[in-house]
Amino acid sequence: LGGLHQSRNVTTVVTEVLVDADDASFQSPSKPIGGFMEEAEAREHEHADGWTVIEDSGRGWRRVVPSPRPREILEMEVIRQLVESGTVTIAAGGGGIPVVRDERNHYAGVEAVIDKDLAASLLARRLDADVFLISTAVPKVSLYYGTPEQQDLEEISVADARRYIAEGHFGRGSMLPKIEAMIEFVEATGREGVITDPAHLAAAAAGGAGTRIVA
């Protein structure tokens, strides 16, 4: 902002995100974290450290941890007030801090990683955002990514997105959670979402770049 001669306030909100203590992911870890490993190294961690490991999208082996779905953002009202005041607000970083609520209505942290895309989708819905943008490493969503048959997508419907998921086009540790986050936003609001890379964010916000996901 300084380089653009903008004088707007910027703040970061440490964000607690409520999850369900009975979420199935606590019994079936699914969120890839950390670097890629050879299978032998992954199996060693599995036996020695109790890790759950998977083969991830043909790129190698990774550890997976519980990733419960975000239900509510505890600091939502504060975030809303900051946004409405014109403050550039950074929230739900890394998916936020996962917490559960006990029978006494007290909150406690849990060992898990909330998917950052699903948390961002929840944040966008609670803020009643006009458009939901996700920045990633590629300018557009693709089918058959990384193959000679790669097909970049300009616009897809929610129905298209669900079909492509069923056909296995999107990797669990890469594009899949972004598409799922977009589906949630578009279905809940009727508005569009866009996925693109940082270089095309401004153009995407104006409708001129990226992959648009529509109802």
Q: Where are these predicted regions, by residue range?
A:
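C-terminal catalytic "cap/lid" subdomain
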Residues: 1-215
